[in-house]
């Protein structure tokens, strides 16, 4: 507020001095009648007029600035400023009253020569210091001052100019603010997110498959890992087939396959083959040569490019060829394709066919008169309900028990059947079916190898938990076979299963679930249990 006070004082001082000078000039004009006085009077009038105009202009400009600054400032300060201005006016009047008694020309020369330049320079310097921020923003102080001097600046016009300056100042500050904001922040920010790349999936590349048999090389002495040498179906449908090709599918299936290939692009959701793999048709000579290379070099069964394995040997392959030539059953041909590694299926099904033996499995299916019956025995519809499902499961259990005991001893097919029976006997509803095959199972327990005995003991352990099934296990033949398990050469898992079976039978007798009526049988049973207990303690 110091700058505003100085401006007010300077304004009052200039007004008083201008009025005093005007009165002095008027007195000189009336007193002096000569020519020199007239000239000096004319000169004084010109000077007084020009100076008074300049003072009026400065007065108007300074008043406008005072009004603009007092609007922004506080009201108590404006009151103090008015009081100080009135005091300053009284002092200046006394000074001018004394100065009029002195020499008038010297006063005029001092006022316009010295005080005018000093006051003006001091006034404009103070104004520039007080309005430094506005001058920096506008960068045109001389232009604004010149405009004020040229216009006669009434109070209303000054108010309108002040509003325009405020808008210009806001525009300048706003532009500066947003320009700074643009440099500090992104006007078009992009969203930040994590890109999840899909995991690569290994798929069969159709382009890498050989189109002709000439593109495949066969080594007579293959290394430990031999590349696949399987042939593929030719892309040309008009190509003639060799007479040594095996017909692995019926005519109807071949027709449906050709129709499906034509509509492959429009029906992607429908698989071309029911087992989910495009078959690889091979000649008999090619398959025989592959099996011969494998047997001569002693390497593992090598896979074709679609990662399917063939575990057939030469005699089994020749027998399978004769079977396929004698039947057109689609189920038999499909099983043969799986065994040859032509069709991709679930690993469990592939393992089951390899362990059972494809020739043995097909022979067992062909032993039935109707193909529909073999399909019912091989496939169980689990989504059926009621008596239909129960009858199918019962038929399946009987079929598995019959096939298992009919397989050769310790054969893969027999061991696979024992695995399935062990899973089926976890439910007591199937125990009455397995009980009828106890004599054959105890024979396998006494004559089979370690793996066969382990599988049979698992079946007996499941059935010993049922009192009705455990009652049929209490006979001399069964207990003698169980007692043979306890020797030093038996596997630990088999010993644990045998001990658990004896404990279950003992608990049923103790609880009264099994009642021994014959006294002789009871004494025999007690003697066997004491002998087994002694063997267990010694071990």
Curated annotation (Swiss-Prot):
One GO location term (cellular component): cytoplasm
UniProt keyword list: Cytoplasm, Nucleus
Composition bias, Basic residues: 1-10
Stretches with biased composition (Basic and acidic residues): 66-80, 88-106
Superkingdom of origin: Eukaryota
The keyword Cytoplasm belongs to this UniProt entry's keyword annotation: yes
Oligomeric form and interacting partners: Homodimer.
Name listed for the protein in its UniProt record: G protein-coupled receptor associated sorting protein 3
Annotated source species: Mus musculus (Mouse)
Upper classification of the organism: Eukaryota, Metazoa, Chordata, Craniata, Vertebrata
